[in-house]
Amino acid sequence: VSPARLLIPLLLTASAFALEPLPEDRGAVGLKQTLRRLASPYRVLHVIAHPDDEDSGTMTYLSRGLGADVTIVSITRGESGANLITDDAFDRLGVLRTLEFRRAAQSYGARLRFTRFADFGYSKTLEETLRNWPQEEVVRDLVRIIREEKPHVVLSRWRGGPQDGHGHHQAAGLLAKQAYAAAGDPQKFPDAGPAWKPLKLYSDNRREDDEWTLTVDSGVYDPLLGRTYAQAARLGMRAHRSQGAGSAIQRPGASVRYYFLEASEVGMADRETSFFDRLDAELPNAVSAAVADAEAVYAVDAPEKGVPALARGLKAARAAGLDDRAALFERAIAQALGLELEFLVEPDEPLTGRFSSFRPYETVATATPGRTLEATARIGREDATIEVSSHDGWQVESLGEGRYRLRAPEQARSSAVHWRRDSVWDMAYGYQGRWGSALPADAVWATATIEVEGQPVTLRAPLEASYIDEQRVQRRRPLAVGPAVSVSLGNPLRVWRKGSGGYDLAVSLESLAAVDGTVRLDAPAGWKVEPEQTGFSFKRAGERRMVSFHVTPPADASGLADVRAVASYGAQESAASFERIHSPGLETAYVSQPAVQQVRAMDVAVADDLRVGYVMGAGDRVPDTVRQFGASLDLLDESALASADLSAYDTILVGIRAYAVRPDLIAHNQRLLEYVEQGGVLVVQYNTPEFDKNFGPYPYKMTSRPEETSEEDSPVRILAPEHPVFTGPNAITEADFDDWVEQRGSKFMVEWDERYQPLVEMNDEGQDPQQGVWLAARHGDGMYVYCALAWYRQLPYAVPGAVRIFANLISLGAEDASWR
């Protein structure tokens, strides 16, 4: 049996329809793209480690140029990388990067899958990565995806050796080879589905002077796209905004990648012209003939001419059991006839007035359990049969003329992302929905069936809500389902300084419907919470309220304790957040996290009455910890940097990557140096090479590829134990560097003026000792500090030693500090 004739299950989840179609996927141009896909029997799987690794040019060429069915599988969602646009970190960042990747993959014309495993932070070595990722389980996931996708060709982005650099990359290359070898063996991972043997395995990441088998030039111009495949791919890469990928313009001309044939079931070769050389995959004759007939009559100004041939192809695909091919024929027919189904939530109040059709409006965006709303399905064909479906048994009442009254069940499934883990230290997610998919399925959808040339053709659309975006433009997104009240407590951990008395804890409430109720804190026995509860009343969805409680732990509190916020309304309770993750140009996703804060009781001292200024950079939660110390903190905006009395602050902190995102900081940097000269303490946290322009009081050099120490347990040597940052108010030893998370630090100096004093030394296994991590210098009457330790990772999780060291760091600015 030819591999192309085997049934391939449709793997598009409902949410795959949430992305608004690109111009190249609509109308006559979209039809031509679909015809290319219908003509190709080949399936390709591209294995990468995390978002933005992909060979975007080759994927675009294969999919949009050759019509191959391309799936990209990413082992992780990039949870622990840097975030250039928001303060989302860990799992929230993974959600954001999933949205970015879906938009990028749409540009390439590819589908997207994920394994269960998480990005645990930058890793320099294969050995460290495999200590964190359970090798056999990652291979199991890759095997499962191979068996579900049934590719003819597997393309590994990485080779599996030191040439790949990053430890995650090396592991991805190695594990892709192991999964390729295991997928066709029914004795291996029998729980991962029926065996499927791909026919070829290639690896990427090669240069012209390396060993290679074939080249792929994505710099070929495609008149259908109006650009080269590489240029089209670059537009997709720009969706990875949180990583700053794809920012450079792709110029016309050759864009060549080199691939090496690692293994083959159809014979090896020194040189090839295509990934599909020597493959005999073919489509049923009736299907191929129908596609050829549709191609023969294709016309941009009369795309409907191909409909009879497409209907014949649809019939042939169904007869052959090729469900995926049948779905492509249905898409082609819809494109040829200009058919589009929309299924929209109607506004609560009818739109009236002469210009009502020109005014943007919003509708209910999130349905709460038991909520009733009205919706309309339209396709523009009177002969269409429309059905409304859901996963959870929504009540559906037809009101005629495509209008429906819908009621969400009391136990409606939440639209929060369906991959979750108990802790950011867990290496794997559990899936509570479609395994390995990018986003959860839509809550409700409509299907419209029409008859074309004797064949039923079905279109599908999720129920969408209308909203107004950041540019005041009306847009749509699938209706979400969530609780009536979202409850959150901010940071997952906080510090309580023993002996400091009570503290205020703010509970954030947001309504998803009109609702009245109360909110309380559940704390351990012996803890005092005032008041016992507080009432709230929301008149409509989208209202927010901060409720403050005063929490007093017992004097003998120690270790970690959980404090939980619970909202009660009617007979229901909510003790979790329901928060939107969104960025302009992307879809919307929702995350739900327990409204629990762990409180770490610590013996930690900090200077009294500290006044701290903070220059926020790309976004972090360091200010929260400063406030937990009892210090007052102001965020310094452009106006403050330009004209405020900076001498009002004992210490000023510059946030992560601030010199990359705050041009006002660069413009007013001299004022900060004058602040130091007059007695202030300025602490600059890790910054990217934009900082490599001598913004300090004395020269330094970072280079465009600065060093970092990624092993969070790498040994640390204190070089200047007598320095005041180590002597008080907390006595710091090397033990305070134990139990750090994810990494030590990033973006170290490689050279510096002798007036800077290096304070610590550290290195990963195999790395030269690094002393450019933490530099301090006297300047005039003050002190200038560059500290590239990963405070933005340690402090939100209240890592004890990091908290103690940071308390000393900000206390350097105290008027009575020992160094003054």
Feature annotation, model-predicted:
Residues 328-346, 354-355, 476-485:
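Proline/serine/threonine-rich low-complexity linkers at boundaries of modular beta-sandwich domains
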Residues 13-15:
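N-terminal signal peptide c-region/cleavage motif recognized by signal peptidases
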Residues 18-45, 125-129, 135-344:
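Metal-dependent de-N-acetylase/amidase catalytic core
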Residues 573-655, 688, 709, 793, ...:
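Aromatic-Pro/Gly-enriched surface loop or interdomain linker
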Residues 19-148, 170, 177-181:
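Active-site rim/loop-helix segments in enzyme catalytic domains that contact anionic ligands
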Residues 355-602, 606-608:
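Long beta-sheet-rich domains in secretory-pathway and surface-associated proteins
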Residues 704-798, 817:
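Catalytic beta-strand/loop cores that center a nucleophilic Ser/Cys/Thr
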Residues 657-738:
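A glycine-rich, often tryptophan-bearing local segment used as a flexible ligand/cofactor-contacting loop or short
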